[in-house]
UniProtKB/Swiss-Prot annotation:
GO terms of biological process kind: translation
Task of the protein: One of the primary rRNA binding proteins, it binds directly to 16S rRNA where it helps nucleate assembly of the platform of the 30S subunit by binding and bridging several RNA helices of the 16S rRNA.
GO molecular function: rRNA binding; structural constituent of ribosome
Keywords: Ribonucleoprotein, Ribosomal protein, RNA-binding, rRNA-binding
HAMAP family named among the record's database cross-references: Ribosomal_uS15_B
Protein name, UniProt field: Small ribosomal subunit protein uS15
SMART domains: Ribosomal_S15 (SM01387)
Species for this entry: Anaeromyxobacter dehalogenans (strain 2CP-C)
Coiled-coil boundaries: none
UniProt similarity note: Belongs to the universal ribosomal protein uS15 family.
Amino acid sequence: MALVQEKKQELVQKYKRHEKDTGSPEVQVALLSERIAYLTEHFKTHKKDHHSRRGLLKLVGQRRRLLDYLRTIDQGRYKTLIDQLGIRK
């Protein structure tokens, strides 16, 4: 299931960098993290859903690439984001 529009808007409002920001790395990572969390819960009850598991792995890879990009352009924004989202060490 895709994210509900209201939840998506809430995440965009929380992580945006300027008024009309919807595509900054921070927003994209936040949206991907929400979808990853949803799918992780889904797999707790649907253990044999291998088709969706592949989609989850693609989302995790996409988030990893965005985080790597963010780390190369601005270390401070990267650290702030991972602290806010509660990912990484």
